[in-house]
Amino acid sequence: MTPYRSRTSTHGRTMAGARGLWRATGMKDEDFGKPIIAIANSFTQFVPGHVHLKDMGQLVAAEIAAAGGVAKEFNTIAVDDGIAMGHDGMLYSLPSRELIADAVEYMVNAHCADALVCISNCDKITPGMLMAAMRLNIPTIFVSGGPMEAGKVVLGGTERSVDLIDAMVVAGDAKVSDADVETIERSACPTCGSCSGMFTANSMNCLTEALGLSLPGNGSALATHVARRGLFEEAGRRIVDLAKRRYEHDDESTLPRAIASFKAFENAMSVDIAMGGSTNTVLHLLAAAQEGEVPFTMADIDRLSRRIPHLCKVSPSTADFYMEDVHRAGGVMGIMGELSRAGLLHEDLPTVHTPTLKAALDHWDIRRPVDDAVRAFFRAAPGGVRTVVPFSTDRLWDSLDDDRETGCIRDLDHAYSRDGGLAVLYGNLAPNGCIVKTAGVDASILTFTGTVRLCESQDEAVARILGGEIQAGDVVLVRYEGPKGGPGMQEMLYPTSYLKSRGLGKVCALVTDGRFSGGSSGLSIGHVSPEAAAGGPIGLVEEGDIIVIDIPARSIVVDLSDEELAARRSAMEARGRAGWKPAKPRKRAVSPALRAYAALTTSADRGAVRDVSQVER
């Protein structure tokens, strides 16, 4: 039997003071000796994906108490990437991931909690909590707030679904009237929950499910549907069971590092590739793997991207399907079921809810014989009412989407492509790799040669696009926006949205050492590593250079000889401290907090995690 961690502060004469403090929180004699379960909530009124989470911690806590545990809730911060987008607020988004990971670690270790429930939802919150879970390696379950419903709008007499990206795109299109822009704006985000497409938030919540760290349906059940309530309640019950198995029966299969093993990371990345998830997931999975000492790297992602088919295309890659449609088609379990039938999944792995993934698929994959309760769960439908109230609808679809030929989730024989929705490119521009979401790239530009239009910041890129300087055949190259150079690795959602609104989405490329929102599509290549501020070749490119992109060959090169690149590098190094910095001044206030982040962070190929060895002696 492994002693409960919490005994450090609850047992023994010398802990009388600590017990006195525990009693002041409401604990009674009979509570000492029970597992203490930390609930990391992320409620905030700033973020629609988190605005409904205020009472979720206590919902989980009630189930923990009923199952024989003691629940203690705390909160983390949560940044809304959409609100922080397009201005200096975005500098803080990625660094907030590290703050969240640290906050969870600090609270759990300072108070010797035995296990953890992570209530997350949006872009950096789920990754930050995942990093913390892998560091701490105590029993952990994730339960997210769920996706929002897709918006509905009637324009020109036709109803169609819309989301946040539609509002951004039409706002940059001078041909769209102010009235229509306002109509879409008012319709784009109708409910609480994470934005309704396969953007970063929903991608990451799907991937915690694929890793085995959350319950079936976590990635896809709508925030507004009563079906999600059951996930919170079940998480409270199961975490107590996991804690007792770990400490009372020495069952190490309950630990995050046992569940989220190398094979589980392969599974999660395979799901990501199959569903054409956000490119940010690459960054976050690499970071989580490093925290858990799992040797999962860009090379593994490259290998998987060449063999995993693209089975699911969701907004922003199409206007036909949204997260509510993914759920109706069976959710993550439906995608994993197709990968299983194709022989592309490790199934002998534990999860927080079943001894093996195979057992989970046997129960939850809608194309296998499943019971009526499972079928009803995946029929959970949007209520179609503007609301910030969770669990406010019990509406059901009339039927499931089990069409694997043309439905939301396809089988191997009807895949969009035999290689997946994400790809890693290498070449003299990105020796350590870069990422492209191929699910969002038009087939006509899978190979592309273009002329560099050099931008030393996202702001300059926006100005050049809206100013009419970018033409068909151009490569908008945005540098010094990486983790160190930004700092903070800004998302380039506005530049990609404005390229689309200007009719350039299928005739231009955007290449950057920054990153892209999960809402970006088009030939958008990010995470170029090493970044410019770290001495990467992207810092040597000049206006008018030619870049050659070949996605099928997984290649990206600037058309320069090795000798020319070496000469440019020598000239850059000769500038001393002035080298490897933007050639043009930027109006950007970088606070001491951001400078500290920049001093410790690494390039995207390492997940932009901190490397404290840079300052250790």
From Swiss-Prot:
Keywords: 2Fe-2S, Amino-acid biosynthesis, Branched-chain amino acid biosynthesis, Iron, Iron-sulfur, Lyase, Magnesium, Metal-binding. Binds 1 [2Fe-2S] cluster per subunit. This cluster acts as a Lewis acid cofactor. The keyword Metal-binding applies. Pathway: Amino-acid biosynthesis; L-isoleucine biosynthesis; L-isoleucine from 2-oxobutanoate: step 3/4; Amino-acid biosynthesis; L-valine biosynthesis; L-valine from pyruvate: step 3/4. It catalyses: (2R)-2,3-dihydroxy-3-methylbutanoate = 3-methyl-2-oxobutanoate + H2O; (2R,3R)-2,3-dihydroxy-3-methylpentanoate = (S)-3-methyl-2-oxopentanoate + H2O. One of its GO terms (cellular component) is cytosol. InterPro entries: Dihydro-acid_dehy_C (IPR042096), DihydroxyA_deHydtase (IPR004404), DiOHA_6PGluconate_deHydtase_CS (IPR020558), ILV_EDD_C (IPR056740), ILV_EDD_N (IPR000581), IlvD/EDD_N (IPR037237). Disulfide bonds: none annotated. The active site is at S517 (proton acceptor). Its cofactor is [2Fe-2S] cluster; Mg(2+). SUPFAM superfamilies: IlvD/EDD N-terminal domain-like, LeuD/IlvD-like. Its EC number is 4.2.1.9. It is an enzyme of class 4 (lyase). Homodimer. This is Dihydroxy-acid dehydratase. It comes from Rhodospirillum rubrum (strain ATCC 11170 / ATH 1.1.1 / DSM 467 / LMG 4362 / NCIMB 8255 / S1). The lineage of its organism: Bacteria, Pseudomonadati, Pseudomonadota, Alphaproteobacteria, Rhodospirillales.
